[in-house]
Amino acid sequence: MLSLDQIPHHIRHGIVGSRLIQIRGRVTQVTGTLLKAVVPGVRIGELCYLRNPDNSLSLQAEVIGFAQHQALLIPLGEMYGISSNTEVSPTGTMHQVGVGEHLLGQVLDGLGQPFDGGHLPEPAAWYPVYQDAPAPMSRKLITTPLSLGIRVIDGLLTCGEGQRMGIFAAAGGGKSTLLASLIRSAEVDVTVLALIGERGREVREFIESDLGEEGLRKAVLVVATSDRPSMERAKAGFVATSIAEYFRDQGKRVLLLMDSVTRFARAQREIGLAAGEPPTRRGYPPSVFAALPRLMERAGQSSKGSITALYTVLVEGDDMTEPVADETRSILDGHIILSRKLAAANHYPAIDVLRSASRVMNQIVSKEHKTWAGDLRRLLAKYEEVELLLQIGEYQKGQDKEADQAIERMGAIRGWLCQGTHELSHFNETLNLLETLTQ
């Protein structure tokens, strides 16, 4: 009989790392979306198979915690068919997603599988869904502006390659239209878009009407609609980030868009409350505020490529102190505020420039660009200051030289701030127009 030392290394490694006895448990309790099962040896984050003895069920679930020697699991699909006879079989692995160039042009579900139920080619690699962010000292500094093709952003809220920004908007603020424009016009190699908690009707409409064949060609979509289980909606954000990380590791410039962080947080809230966590700020358990930086810090520069990320945040009643909005703004490198008032006036993109900011803009733009942007901001602020007086007929020309200048140029400024959804503006063209407006 061979000793372990006489077995070839690759076989020995497999034997040492494997479970020689198949472990099975059984469901002991089902409460809402949470399962409890006695399954020895499982780890948090590990996937398990749920099967009925008559093979009427085949479903995966993820271990999210433990309580009194029982594992707490959340299924990755619908719970119909689970019974007291359902067996729980650990897989010994965490959730991974298949990645590769074949994903370009594909629409995936929240778990990284084809949305239409089809089959994908053999992946180039498998990436874990949960990964650590790049070490702080290994990140390259953000030094290069990234042209997003939107004049108001490139000119006044310049985004750097590897920056993370939030797009804050109430319902109907025009964020979906802005995202579609960004996908078509951003000067990047690959775009990864996560649609989390969207209405099912809007998905195909967005792909065919807003995105179009041109936008889809260099994009990967990860979609988890509002009717999907909470675990799938929560995982969609991590799956999209893992796919973006693969393309970053190939040396590409990646644009990661997520719509929306609020619905991601709500899915995490459902999971946390089901696991028995105490509700804190407006009903959100502590795990939500731990998940947000764990997700967002994975974007950014690495030694190989970059992920520039824009996350949309639904703001309830324009309340920027709402917990998810407040926490997200503190994590990210800038914020773009969309105004319902501007959207109602058919001013698109409906960006409120004076309430928006890019935290890295001053580090990456030229001195002239910084001056022109500052001058235009001053004109916008001055016009806002005297707008009410203009509306009631109380402003007299000549009272304030800077106000006169702002009023005189406001038509041209608004024309520059507005941009059609299919209109592309190159970075240098944007700067030339910005210079003209402020001279």
Swiss-Prot record:
One of its GO terms (cellular component) is type III protein secretion system complex. ATP binds at residues 172-177. Disruption phenotype: Deletion of the gene does not affect the growth rate but causes total attenuation of the pathogen in a mouse model of bubonic plague. Deletion mutant is not able to secrete the virulence-associated V antigen (LcrV) and is attenuated in a subcutaneous model of plague. The gene is sctN. SUPFAM superfamilies: P-loop containing nucleoside triphosphate hydrolases. The lineage of its organism: Bacteria, Pseudomonadati, Pseudomonadota, Gammaproteobacteria, Enterobacterales. It catalyses: ATP + H2O + cellular proteinSide 1 = ADP + phosphate + cellular proteinSide 2. Its main location: cytoplasm. It is found in: Cytoplasm. ATPase activity and YopE secretion are inhibited by selected small-molecule ATPase inhibitors. Coiled coil: none annotated. Its EC number is 7.4.2.8. Deletion mutant may function as an attenuated, genetically engineered, live vaccine effective against bubonic plague. Mice vaccinated twice with this mutant at varying doses are protected against bubonic plague in a dose-dependent manner. This is Type 3 secretion system ATPase. It is an enzyme of class 7 (translocase). Keywords: ATP-binding, Cytoplasm, Nucleotide-binding, Plasmid, Protein transport, Translocase, Transport, Virulence. ATPase component of the type III secretion system (T3SS), also called injectisome, which is used to inject bacterial effector proteins into eukaryotic host cells. Acts as a molecular motor to provide the energy that is required for the export of proteins. Required for type III secretion apparatus (T3SA) formation, proper protein secretion, host cell invasion and virulence. May play a critical role in T3SS substrate recognition, disassembly of the effector/chaperone complex and unfolding of the effector in an ATP-dependent manner prior to secretion. It comes from Yersinia pestis. The keyword Metal-binding does not apply.
